[in-house]
Amino acid sequence: MTKCEFYREGERITGFSVSGHSGYAEAGSDIVCAAISAAVSLAEATINDVCGAKAKVRVKEADARVTLTLPASCEEEDTVQAVLAGMMVYLIDLRDQYPDYIEVLEV
């Protein structure tokens, strides 16, 4: 199962961590894993490359974990928050379709 955690300080989403393998299918054929990976990649690219937020990204291949942490403030804060909120809504929808393979939490 893939675990997706969104971190908050008050109303502000400060980052996320996605870890584990969904286990829906074998590597290379796992549509749940592919959908999650695409969401993570799109969010990171939009936040850092388009918005210039300079979020810290850590990848731990040992436990298939990607963590993104926002700086204390961003020039494009509203846009960055919209990207993270959209990612969370997308992953919740995916969880509703494949509840045995993805977990989404706000912490």
Question: What kind of region is each of these model predictions?
Answer:
Residues 1-31, 41, 45-107:
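N-terminal intrinsically disordered, cationic/polar leader segments
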Residues 32-36:
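Short, conserved glycine- and acidic-residue-centered signature motifs
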